[in-house]
């Protein structure tokens, strides 16, 4: 049976496999019931993509439409059809000067940038206050306290960016412009306001056609009421000495959401909540998205980066997972806050392909590591029980990896082409919150990205080549 026939057969069986897998999963994680019935279940039909995606290991490059360069040459922005490619030069300017150059060049490239981003920022702020009246004094105190914790060079860059962007405007005011404090706030959305959901998969050389690792990271984020984030995708190259970081994210943001350095250390953030929730603490805390940036600038291998970030986890504002890979190793940093650890709810641990998983979780493929929005190591906080979204995605990833067997880049692309995206009946891996999917092929160094355009991701996403981590 060829791979295409196997895929079609597997797709027809997915609803049955996932249902059986989830029922088994639930019975392991929670209190077993005497029987399982179909009472209350609603038949929703097939949610699978029946069309073969026709992927290959090669992704096309887009052509530059227009480019913009700052007066002093510290920032260059190339406009492509799907994204903006940004180059920031820290060799020939101070961090503050680079930040200023970025803001000014950005406004040339996207004159209505403030009209795009400011409404999105306030949607996140309103989400933070969850319907309550917004206390702007409290918000500003939170932001300025966290900003003060950021390493000086990054802080200077943020402030340079905010100074140039604001052009003298101050205070929180929803007016279609970005003031100084708003431009500071936008740089700390994951640390101060909070992201949503993500997932990741990495497969080692023993199960790839080339014998080299392939890593995937799917970012799920709030797109904005008008899908603002899909209008300003970016790939930013931060050049400092002999080190270059490539950050796949949002135009204008300086934090690290999905990023890789020129040694191939690849890091992606994934949110993790605390069971029954806990009070948010920001005093004495650090911004983990900027500590990731420091790790990428400092370490040339995934192990050292993972150990550094896991050791610091108690100092961060939110519980989270981190995908950390290089060509030889793969890790999930299960990073709880110190408050969660002290309450006995979680432990800081680095999960590998060989780690013992918590009771009830099944993963069938050695040399493959899957991450969703909960911890999975034995003895850590259980975010699976009662959370069908997490259970469903983990079970599906497990089945998809078994189906692929030996992976090519095309197979990894296909992980995100199994399910109909624009549906809300069944939790899916590739869903309507997807902002981008990034695949790193360690055999070539190529970085393949599918950027969401419009209201939601395509059922069969189109990947483009945005660069090579070994090229500067």
Model segments located where?
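Short intrinsically disordered, low-complexity coil segments enriched in acidic
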Residues: 2-3, 437
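Bacterial N-terminal signal peptides that target proteins for export
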Residues: 3-17
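C-terminus-biased signal that marks the final domain/tail of proteins
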Residues: 29, 36-197, 296-472
């Amino acid at each position: 049976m060829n791979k295409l026939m196997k895929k079609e057969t597997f797709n027809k069986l997915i609803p049955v496999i996932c249902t059986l897998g989830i029922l088994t999963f639930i019975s392991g994680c929670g209190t077993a019931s005497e029987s399982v019935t179909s009472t209350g279940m609603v038949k929703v039909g097939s949610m699978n993509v029946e069309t073969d995606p026709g992927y290959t290991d090669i992704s096309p490059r887009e052509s530059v439409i227009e480019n913009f360069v700052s007066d002093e040459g510290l920032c260059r922005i190339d406009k492509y059809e799907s994204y903006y490619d940004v180059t920031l030069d820290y060799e020939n300017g101070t961090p503050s000067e680079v930040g200023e150059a970025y803001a000014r060049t950005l406004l040339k490239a996207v004159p209505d940038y403030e009209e795009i981003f400011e409404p999105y920022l306030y949607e996140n702020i309103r989400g933070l206050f969850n319907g309550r009246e917004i206390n702007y004094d409290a918000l500003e105190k939170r932001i300025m306290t966290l900003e003060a914790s950021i390493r000086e060079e990054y802080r200077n860059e943020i402030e340079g960016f905010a100074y140039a962007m604001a052009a003298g405007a101050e205070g929180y005011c929803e007016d279609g412009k970005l003031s100084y404090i708003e431009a500071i706030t936008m740089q700390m959305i994951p640390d101060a306001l909070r992201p949503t959901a993500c997932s990741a998969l990495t497969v080692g050389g023993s199960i790839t056609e080339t014998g080299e690792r392939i890593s995937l990271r799917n970012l799920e984020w709030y797109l904005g009421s008008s899908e603002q984030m899909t209008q300003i995708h970016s790939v930013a190259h931060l050049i400092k000495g002999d080190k270059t970081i490539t950050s796949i994210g949002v135009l204008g943001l300086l934090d690290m959401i999905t990023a890789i350095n020129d040694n191939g250390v690849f890091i992606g953030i994934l949110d993790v909540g605390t069971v029954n929730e806990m009070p948010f603490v920001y005093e004495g805390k650090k911004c983990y998205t900027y500590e990731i940036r420091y790790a990428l600038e400092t370490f040339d291998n995934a192990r050292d980066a993972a150990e550094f970030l896991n050791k610091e986890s108690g100092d961060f504002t939110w519980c989270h997972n981190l995908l950390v890979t290089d060509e030889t190793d793969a890790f999930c940093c299960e990073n709880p806050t110190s408050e969660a650890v002290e309450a006995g709810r979680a432990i800081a641990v680095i999960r590998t392909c060989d780690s013992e998983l918590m009771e009830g979780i099944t993963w069938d493929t050695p040399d493959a590591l899957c991450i969703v929005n909960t911890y999975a190591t034995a003895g850590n906080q259980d975010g699976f029980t009662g959370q069908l979204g997490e259970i469903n995605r983990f079970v599906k990833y497990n089945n998809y990896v078994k189906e692929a067997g030996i992976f090519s880049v095309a197979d990894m692309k296909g992980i995100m082409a199994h399910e109909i995206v624009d549906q809300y009946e069944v939790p899916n891996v590739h869903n309507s919150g997807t902002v981008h999917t990034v695949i790193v092929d360690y055999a070539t160094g190529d970085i393949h990205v599918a950027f969401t355009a419009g209201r939601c991701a395509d059922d069969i996403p189109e990947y483009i080549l945005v660069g090579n981590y070994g090229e500067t």
